[in-house]
């Protein structure tokens, strides 16, 4: 039940009513922040994505600050999660994604992103439209970046032509409401803290 509650709070339609941001971000209101959206294009797989500040500061309870886990382990599909949002990416027209969440994160602070997946079967690739088929193969992707204040970022974790890929986009809203996504590199590589 707890997992389902958390998942519901990650849905855009319910985001405002969930008190959605972790206490860490609520307690840092007024600091320079960026917006981070996390999406997945994987279907029928078990996956978990987490992100954390690289400086690894701890709060008075000894917990790591700035840690969040948008995804929950489980065999969720877009339909089961109650979402029908479609995301258009270069090389992937209108592919549905499983889940979506949006977070306020401290700007100018390095973040590390860790995405882990256990593929249970197959799924459509979002880069070339190919299909990746495996059976209980665990794949980990780790990358980092430093968000800029006021910018909106999207992390997309999906199945590429050969394996799950972790990609970072900067989102810009132009006049007239049109939204564009520009691919940007992870600039910190495979680092931990």
State the predicted function of each range.
Residues 1-20:
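Sec-dependent bacterial lipoprotein signal peptides
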Residues 18-138, 142-144, 152-193:
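Short loop/turn and low-complexity linker motifs enriched in small/turn-promoting residues
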